[in-house]
Design a protein with these regions (language model features):
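Outer-membrane beta-barrel proteins
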Residues: 2-4, 38-42, 53-55, 93-101, ...
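Transmembrane beta-barrel wall of Gram-negative outer-membrane proteins
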Residues: 4-35, 40-75, 104, 109-121
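A short alpha-helix capping/helix-coil boundary motif
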Residues: 28-32, 88-91, 157-160
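Flexible loop and strand-edge segments within Gram-negative outer membrane beta-barrel domains
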Residues: 36, 41, 60-109, 132-139, ...
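Face-selective signature of the C-terminal outer-membrane beta-barrel domain
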Residues: 104-192
Length: 192
């Protein structure tokens, strides 16, 4: 599946699904990518993702493993166009540093198990883990060196206390856990 759009926007998808094989197993997957130059100056984007799952479907139980991930690299265009540019330059972007980007990826892992104990009762257990990592990079003009843990620079009798900098802030995060449910149906009441 391919789609083309304004501002050199391109979306590509490839997906597959086996359906139930041998009355017990199924595999599904998808790859996606979106790229665009963006409407605003230097507001490009490059987005990639995938999804994979494998499942076992028994008579009284289901076991399914899922993994999906995405990565994005986008040029910054957070601020709107100033009023004085609306008539003459509607695509104006105040960010002019060539690598003013947000670059981040995140991957999710999940394992799901469901067991039908009897006609009225089933148990569900799921585990999940997510890892994310990335940064944003930006130009910062006239920054105090001390704010970055840097010492002043002495050149002859002159002391330099501020400078233009390229700043990159990183994020590296992990999250995981488990969920559990027991469902029981009675004549006039459902318990979870």
């Amino acid at each position: 599946n391919n789609t083309f759009g304004s501002y050199n926007t391109l979306k590509n998808n490839v997906e597959f699904g086996t359906g139930l094989m041998g009355e017990k197993f199924a595999f599904d997957g998808r790859l996606s990518q979106i790229t665009s130059d963006g409407y605003m100056d230097r507001a490009s984007s490059d987005l990639k993702s995938f999804y994979l799952s494998v499942g076992y479907f028994g008579k009284t139980e289901i076991l399914k493993a899922v993994m999906f991930s995405g990565h994005e690299c986008t040029y910054q265009a957070w601020y709107g166009v100033p009023l004085n540019y609306l008539e003459s330059n509607r695509t104006y972007n105040p960010y002019d540093y060539e690598n003013e980007v947000d670059n981040y990826g995140q991957t999710h892992y999940q394992l799901h198990y469901s067991k039908k104990a009897n006609e009225n009762t089933n148990v569900n257990i799921s585990g999940h883990y997510t890892h994310g990592e990335g940064y944003y990079e930006q130009f910062k003009g006239g920054e105090d060196l001390a704010d970055y843990g840097l010492e002043n620079i002495l050149i002859g009798n002159d002391t330099i206390t501020e400078s233009n900098l390229i700043r990159r802030k990183w994020l590296n995060n992990d999250f995981g856990g488990f969920t559990f449910s027991l469902n029981h149906k009675m004549e006039k009441l459902n318990l979870t």
